[in-house]
Regions:
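Conserved beta-sheet core of the metallophosphoesterase superfamily
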Residues: 94-171
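Core catalytic region of metal-dependent phosphoesterases/phosphodiesterases
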Residues: 3-6, 10-104
C-alpha cells in the first residue's frame, strides 16, 4: 500500500516547545516529537508498504541519531527533496529507495484511479490538473502562503483560459 507524508522535520527544535514551534505541534521536546512520529509510523506502515515523503524529512542528514531513527522507520521510503533536507551523507541517502524532486504515479481511492503529481513545493500548474490529477505537496505548512496558494489554484481552475488566446500569437 502507498502512503504519503511531508514536513516531518525530525530533530527540528523549532517544531516543538524547545523552539519557536512554527506549526503549533503538541510536543515539549524534539525527543518526544521524534518518538511519537516513529511509533505512529511503525504502527501503520509495514515493510511491504511504500511511503512517499514529500520533503523536509529532517533538518540535517549527517546526524547519527537521525540516521538511526530513519533506519527504524518501516517501509520503502521515497524522498522528495525539500529545502531542509541535507543529503550529503551517503549513509542517510541509502535509507531511501529513491530520492527525487518530482514524480507522477497512479493511485486508486474509493474505486477510482487518479494521477498524482508529487513534489515538495506547490506549483500553480501541474500535469493533468484540469483532467482530475491531484498535486500532493508539503512545504507551506499552515501559513499565509498556503492560503494564498489555495486561492490562486481555485482561481486558475475556475478560469480555464489558454495563455495564447484563440491560437494566435500574442505580444
Amino acid at each position: 500500500m502507498n502512503y504519503f507524508i511531508g514536513d516531518l522535520h525530525l530533530f527540528n527544535r523549532n517544531q516543538t516547545g524547545e523552539g519557536v514551534n512554527y506549526d503549533g505541534r503538541p510536543f515539549a521536546t524534539v525527543a518526544e516529537m521524534n518518538q511519537y512520529i516513529l511509533e505512529h509510523w511503525n504502527a501503520k506502515i509495514t515493510n511491504g508498504d511504500t511511503v512517499y515523503i514529500l520533503g523536509d524529512m529532517a533538518m540535517r542528514g549527517r546526524n547519527e541519531a537521525l540516521i538511526a531513527l530513519v533506519a527504524q522507520l518501516k517501509g520503502q521510503k521515497i524522498l522528495f527533496r525539500g529545502n531542509h533536507d541535507d543529503l550529503s551523507d551517503y549513509r542517510y541517502q541509502k535509507l531511501f529507495a529513491d530520492i527525487t524532486d518530482y514524480r507522477e504515479i497512479s493511485e486508486s481511492f474509493d474505486g477510482q484511479s487518479y494521477k498524482l503529481c508529487l513534489m515538495h513545493y506547490p506549483i500553480l500548474m501541474w500535469n493533468g490538473q484540469h483532467r482530475g490529477s491531484i498535486l500532493l505537496y508539503a512545504h507551506t505548512h499552515n501559513t499565509v502562503e498556503e492560503t494564498f496558494f489555495q486561492k490562486c489554484v481555485k482561481e486558475l481552475n475556475e478560469n480555464k483560459k489558454l495563455s495564447v488566446q484563440q491560437g494566435k500569437p500574442i505580444r
